[in-house]
């Protein structure tokens, strides 16, 4: 009888051990399943992070390409500036009255602007008193230049002299002699008074100085004329 009871206790103990082992196996399986799910979630999160980083890089490249295109369009990239300066110093581009000299500047700044010219002689101290900014007529280059902002009395007798005003012409000086940076607009902007020459529109004209002599070595750029 005692041996039968002992056998029964042994059987119960063995069954409890088996049940404990089964529970342990189930718990381990659950832990492994949770760990696997965590690894999968981390993997998906890593993929999303890489995708966002790649998109950010693409956006940065697009912004760089756009900025480079805008700089080139304005003729302010180093290659364009070097070509322009070399052409100016060599007098390669003709003016309406004389070849380009060290006192005259010429810039083909974009495919929208035929040309922008600036006569630096009698250059004033203030932004709105410089002389002789002229815009070439885009549709018919053989027509006379349009006079813009002529405060120089020597130009008053020209056929492109005083006329109606043109809005939206602004000049920015990054270095005006020893003064500080400034932003302003021309107070006297003029166009050809004759109806045969259309004034068109002027936008985004800026003035940048190269070196310390803005009256001779200034660079204009424009986005539309």
Curated annotation (Swiss-Prot):
Organism domain of life: Viruses
Name used for this protein in its record: Minor capsid protein VP2
Function (record text): Minor structural protein that forms a portal-like structure at a unique three-fold axis of symmetry, following binding to the host receptor. The channel formed by VP2 may allow the delivery of the viral genome through the host endosomal membrane.
Subcellular location: Virion; Host cytoplasm
Note from the entry: Translated by a ribosomal termination-reinitiation process from the bicistronic mRNA coding for VP1 and VP2.
Main subcellular location of this protein, as a coarse class: virion
Organism of this sequence: Bovine enteric calicivirus NB (isolate Bovine/United States/N ebraska/1980)
Entry's free-text remark on domains: The N-terminus domain points away from the virion surface.
Annotated keywords: Capsid decoration protein, Capsid protein, Host cytoplasm, Virion
Subunit structure and binding partners: Homooligomer. The portal-like structure consists in 12 copies of VP2. Interacts with capsid protein VP1.
GO CC entries: host cell cytoplasm; viral capsid, decoration
